């Protein structure tokens, strides 16, 4: 069973350049610019896994989160300013995450690559602390701390553990 996948759609630079507002191209080498968010009026954030392509909206499963929390919006705006100012993905996500209050709950917005390794370990620790059930949905899982913790949790058989991954990434 040979599968043929079309190349991903490409943005036409002249289309982006014709937009009536300033844009900044971020080089995707050596690090991929993978951010996907809108900060609206300093009050709301729309974010998730969705690439802003027709295929992403119509053919792919994605998750989208909308939060109306000015403190969270401020953190995303801070990350945007990092990207806008430096124009370099590798220099993004190094700001220390701030704990913010969202309706009486503490929250932090984490950005990568700056905090990527730390986040991998934090996610692994959170998985390891599960008491009842874990559900994992990721196109691919290659992070050592996460894989190791999943293997340990599975071996202990103490929680209901299930995961979905992109099968094309497994072949």
Can you say where each PLM-predicted feature lies in the sequence?
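Charged, low-complexity intrinsically disordered terminal segments
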Residues: 1-171
